[in-house]
From Swiss-Prot:
InterPro entries: GreA/GreB_C_sf, TF_GreA/GreB_CS, Tscrpt_elong_fac_GreA, Tscrpt_elong_fac_GreA/B, Tscrpt_elong_fac_GreA/B_C, Tscrpt_elong_fac_GreA/B_fam, Tscrpt_elong_fac_GreA/B_N, Tscrpt_elong_fac_GreA/B_N_sf. Residues 17-75 form a coiled coil. Keywords: Coiled coil, DNA-binding, Transcription, Transcription regulation. This is Transcription elongation factor GreA. PROSITE patterns: GREAB_1 (PS00829), GREAB_2 (PS00830). Transmembrane segments: none annotated. Belongs to the GreA/GreB family. Disulfide bonds: none annotated. One of its GO terms (molecular function) is DNA binding. SUPFAM superfamilies: FKBP-like, GreA transcript cleavage protein, N-terminal domain. One of its GO terms (biological process) is DNA-templated transcription elongation. Necessary for efficient RNA polymerase transcription elongation past template-encoded arresting sites. The arresting sites in DNA have the property of trapping a certain fraction of elongating RNA polymerases that pass through, resulting in locked ternary complexes. Cleavage of the nascent transcript by cleavage factors such as GreA or GreB allows the resumption of elongation from the new 3'terminus. GreA releases sequences of 2 to 3 nucleotides. It comes from Rhizorhabdus wittichii (strain DSM 6014 / CCUG 31198 / JCM 15750 / NBRC 105917 / EY 4224 / RW1).
Length: 158
């Protein structure tokens, strides 16, 4: 059953989902053709091509339904339109770690999250710990390697 809870994301995340949906919908008729071709080869009980195509069709249909659900619940947020002194979805934050080394993250949705580029999900342990914090607040996050401590040094809405 689909959820009716709003799903915050940036315009970039919405674009990524829309492009993936278009790609999957374009693949859909190709899979149907592959199923028909495999079906023409006879006995379906031992037809690996048929079963692989049917499995791929199921994956595509599930992915399409998931993306359509997420897009229907999307609440697109433009960080440049936000302001305030607390960390919220879309904010870009500069933190000082245990070594006083600055690290910078933007709080984003699950679709856009990519730690390598400094984008963390609001649902991640660090994202959850940061939401609502202000400059000079300390943040403690438990990660597999132990507890990490950060100091919020800057909040930007860019």
């Amino acid at each position: 059953m689909a959820s009716i809870e709003k799903l915050p994301m940036l315009a970039e995340g919405q674009k990524m989902l829309t492009e993936e949906l278009a790609r999957l919908k374009a693949e859909r008729p190709l899979i149907i053709d592959a199923i028909e071709e495999a079906r023409a080869h006879g006995d379906l009980s031992e037809n690996a091509e048929y079963h692989a195509a049917k499995e791929r069709q199921g994956q595509i249909e599930a992915s399409i339904a998931d993306i359509e659900d997420r897009l229907s619940r999307a609440q697109v947020i433009d960080p440049s339109m936000l302001s305030g002194d607390k960390i919220v979805f879309g904010a870009t934050v500069t933190l000082l770690d245990d070594d006083e080394k600055p690290v910078r993250y933007q709080i984003v949705g699950q679709t856009e999250a990519d730690a390598k580029t400094g984008k963390i999900s609001y649902n991640s342990p660090l994202g959850r710990a940061l939401i609502g914090k202000k400059v000079d607040d300390e943040v403690e996050v438990t990660v597999p390697s132990g507890d990490r401590f950060y100091l919020v040094s800057k909040i930007e809405f860019i």
